[in-house]
Structures are given as C-alpha cells and as structure tokens.
Amino acid sequence: VTAGESFGTIAVKYGITVDALIIANPTVNPNAIPVGTVLSIPAAPAEGDSASVLPTPIPVTLQAPACYQDTAWRIICFLDSSNPSATPIEGVSATLRYLSADGTLKEAVAYSLLNRIPAGGTLPLYAVFPADKTWNGSMDAELRSAIPSLAVSSTVEVSGTAIELNAEGTSARVTGKITAGDAGAGEYWVLLVGRNGQGKITTARRFSVNLPAGETSVEFAFQVYSLSGMIETVDVLAEPAP
C-alpha cells in the first residue's frame, strides 16, 4: 500500500470488489491501512465475467470532460464528478472514450484526485491518453465505479485562502492554512482546481502537506499552471492522506 491508497482505490485498480479485498485480508482494518502494508489481491473474475468485476456504481453526476493536448500530443482530461447522495463515496472512476482517425475506439480510465467525495460534494477526475496528433477534440465519459466510503475521515479545514494570478491569468499562486481536528494527524492532501470564467477546469494538481508533530495547523503555498486559457478561480480542497 502506498500513500493515498484505500481499499476502494485498490479494488478499482485491480478490477475486483471491495468485499473480495476485505475477505482476502481479514486482519487488515480497511479504515486505517498503514503505508507499506502488503495486501493479498484475489484473482479477478475470468474473462467473460467482466460484468461482475465491479459492483454497480452509486449514482454520480459526471460533467463533460475538459481535454487538452500537451506539447507531446498526449491528451489530458479532467471532468467534474458530483456526489448527490447523503453519504460520502470513494473509488470513483469513469471510462473516457473517443474514436481515433483510423476508426479505433480509444479508452482511458479517469480516477479522482482525492479519495473521498463528501455528501453533496464535487471532485475532478483525471486521465491521460497516449499521444495522438489526429485527435479531433471529441470525448465521451461513462461512470465506471463509485462505492460507499469505508474510511472514517478526521476533520480538516482550509482557511485564509488567498489566490494571486499572474498578469496573463495562466498561473495562480495559492496560499492558505490547513487546520486538523486532531493534533498529530500527519500528512494531508491539498487539491487545487483552476477554472476559467465558464467554470471549465483548466488545471488541477494535488500537493502534500505535513502537519508538524503536536500542531493542529500548517500553512501552505502552491502554484498551478493552466493547460489552456486563463484561470479565473481556484477551488481549494483538502483531506487527510490515508
């Protein structure tokens, strides 16, 4: 288990259910998995049983993908995923597809940039396609997975946020403070999501912040850069790292 992984994200990664992963690891607490834990990964269902690999996802509202090409012609995509339910969810992913110039259907899986989406919350998903100079800009999205959150999340608050844009509006420096509910909670993730005037995601990046021992708050300062066009606003989200 590496930093940032949960039973939900690991299950999605290996194409198995969370229940199967829990049964295969009866001595591991899914709500508190130490980094470095070695898990037993059960075999995925045989070919032909793919429909039963992932549980039916909890309803999630997906927005149209915002996709850009970098200097290497890779296709980088973001899309908002919103949780309409009254409880947190995790393991959210979507399958992105487009038809290439040669008639081949290209697919990539977009994963959430934080583990959990709180009740009523919105979180971007992220995917990268290999280089394709002939891509015509089209992209479809289909919900792939979303499960109830098994994690017990400690309280975290973001305050004192200040956003400074450069003259061109193509980069943003964001400062603020993370306040934890419990001292010594350790590592936190801070996600910055830049948007243009229409609310379209132009950049998103996750950073790590380490809370000093015995302290309940820590200040942060991070920079993000637009993949295309101007940044008008920046969402600042945070959660404890697993």
Language-model segments: what does each one mean?
Residues 1-17, 82:
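Primarily a LysM-type cell-wall glycan-binding module
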Residues 25, 81-86, 178-182:
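Asparagine-centered strand-capping/turn motif at beta-strand->loop junctions
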Residues 48-68, 126-173, 203-204, 210, ...:
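Terminal connector regions
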Residues 72-78, 170-174:
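Short, solvent-exposed loop/turn segments enriched in Ser/Thr/Gly
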Residues 87-91, 106, 183-187, 201-202:
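Short acidic/proline- and small/hydrophobic-mixed sequence motifs that coincide with surface turns
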Residues 94-97, 110-111, 188-193, 207:
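Hydrophobic beta-strand segments
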Residues 105-134, 201-229:
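Intrinsically disordered, low-complexity Pro/Gly/Ser/Thr-rich segments with frequent PxxP/GP/PP motifs
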